[in-house]
């Protein structure tokens, strides 16, 4: 993998949206010249959903498992899309310069605000116009027409905040850690509705997040291993056995 001087930015949500928005990202390659390998985007397994705008340029998603090579099969996506949770890594490619803007949403928050079936979005990228009502489509238009990314962040927060305040569960957890979030979802699933059996709770988790509790636990463990490894690298003492034990792998 090669790197470039392209602009990449990350915004964390305000505290009132912490249990709804995972983060906001922008990628802008309009001012740099990238070679073929640098125009591939490698996205990891993700429990989140995403609102994705291609403000300039295009994106083509490679077939699952295809290597980042010119002959690999690929398909273009719309300029404005909803990405569901992904259970596998995803590779995409930009034919030329691009400017993309992405809002990562917790899947249960998206379901509460829109009524969408998150499970039906698993491993899918869908044009926004096919799934959202007029209010949400108006947001997509406003974000696309904004002057800069800071304005886009402000538009998204102003749109989401009243909707999340109205629809959020009373026990939604203000945490950016996947382990904390998945435990909060499991607790709400176990105490919601008339039926409180284990099977019914698991069905609610799948309905709200698109994934099983076991998968969410595994993603949380992977995230913790990443943070443990990053801290160990910063401290100059990486001991993989200790990292595995601290992350629940040993």
Across the structure, where does each feature detected by a protein language model lie?
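Residues within the DNA-recognition helix of helix-turn-helix
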Residues: 204
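Short, basic, alpha-helical segments at the C-terminal edge of helix-turn-helix-like DNA-binding modules
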Residues: 217-227
């Amino acid at each position: 993998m090669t790197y470039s001087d392209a602009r990449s930015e990350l915004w964390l949500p305000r505290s009132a949206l912490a249990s709804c928005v995972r983060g906001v990202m922008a990628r802008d390659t309009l001012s740099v010249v990238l070679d073929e390998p640098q125009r591939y985007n490698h996205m990891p397994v993700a429990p989140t959903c995403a609102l994705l705008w291609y403000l300039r340029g295009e994106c083509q998603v490679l077939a699952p498992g295809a290597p980042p090579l010119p002959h690999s099969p690929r398909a273009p996506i719309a300029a404005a899309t909803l990405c569901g949770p992904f259970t596998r890594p995803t590779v995409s490619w930009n034919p030329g310069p691009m400017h993309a803007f992405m809002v990562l949403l917790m899947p249960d928050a998206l379901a509460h605000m829109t009524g969408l079936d998150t499970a039906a979005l698993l491993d899918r990228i869908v044009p926004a116009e096919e799934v959202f009502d007029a209010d949400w489509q108006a947001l997509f238009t406003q974000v696309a027409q904004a002057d800069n990314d800071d304005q886009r962040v402000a538009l998204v927060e102003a749109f989401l905040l009243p909707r999340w305040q109205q629809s959020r569960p009373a026990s939604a957890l203000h945490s950016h850690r996947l382990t904390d979030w998945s435990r909060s979802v499991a607790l709400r699933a176990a105490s919601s509705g008339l039926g409180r059996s284990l099977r019914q709770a698991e069905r609610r988790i799948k309905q709200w997040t698109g994934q099983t509790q076991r998968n969410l636990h595994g993603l949380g463990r992977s995230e913790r291993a990443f943070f443990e490894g990053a801290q160990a690298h910063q401290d100059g003492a990486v001991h993989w056995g200790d990292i595995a034990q601290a992350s629940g792998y040993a």
